[in-house]
């Protein structure tokens, strides 16, 4: 399976999981050039959640949770800013950055995976 297909499958699995947790999916693979994309944007009651999905099929060398680098965090923050510029109806919402880490077949949802000053 190609890397993109694996990523899409993991993101679909994450979306299904988030639906079971009663989050409303607003966007999937939101492109925010030049920074990249946000895997999933969702509403958790009155909080706007920007979600990065990381998948590892083998955890011998690293867990999916370890793959969210500082550089990626900065790209997510910048991408979230662009999303808010394009969607002013969410400007007054609380925002949160979460990580969905999928290791083999286990899903770990880390709320507030990193903070923003």
From Swiss-Prot:
Which pairs of Cys residues are joined through disulfide bonds in the record? none
Q: Which GO terms describe its molecular function?
A: nucleic acid binding
Q: Which domain of life is it from?
A: Bacteria
Q: Which InterPro entries match?
A: Restrct_endonuc-II-like, tRNA_endonuc-like_dom_sf, UPF0102_YraN-like
Coiled coil region boundaries: none
**SUPFAM superfamilies cross-referenced by the UniProt entry:** Restriction endonuclease-like
Cross-referenced HAMAP family: UPF0102 (MF_00048)
Q: Which family does it belong to?
A: Belongs to the UPF0102 family.
Q: What is this protein called?
A: UPF0102 protein FTN_0424
- Species this chain originates from: Francisella tularensis subsp. novicida (strain U112)
């Amino acid at each position: 399976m190609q890397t993109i297909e694996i990523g899409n499958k993991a993101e679909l699995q994450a979306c299904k999981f988030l639906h079971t947790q009663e989050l409303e999916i607003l966007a999937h693979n939101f492109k925010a050039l030049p920074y990249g994309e946000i895997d999933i944007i969702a509403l958790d009651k009155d909080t706007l959640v920007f979600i990065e999905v990381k998948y590892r099929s083998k955890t011998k060398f690293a867990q999916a949770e370890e793959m969210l680098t500082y550089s990626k965090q900065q790209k997510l923050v910048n991408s979230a800013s662009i999303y808010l510029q394009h969607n002013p109806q969410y400007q007054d919402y609380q925002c949160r950055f979460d990580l969905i880490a999928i290791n083999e077949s286990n899903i770990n949802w880390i709320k507030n995976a990193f903070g923003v000053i």
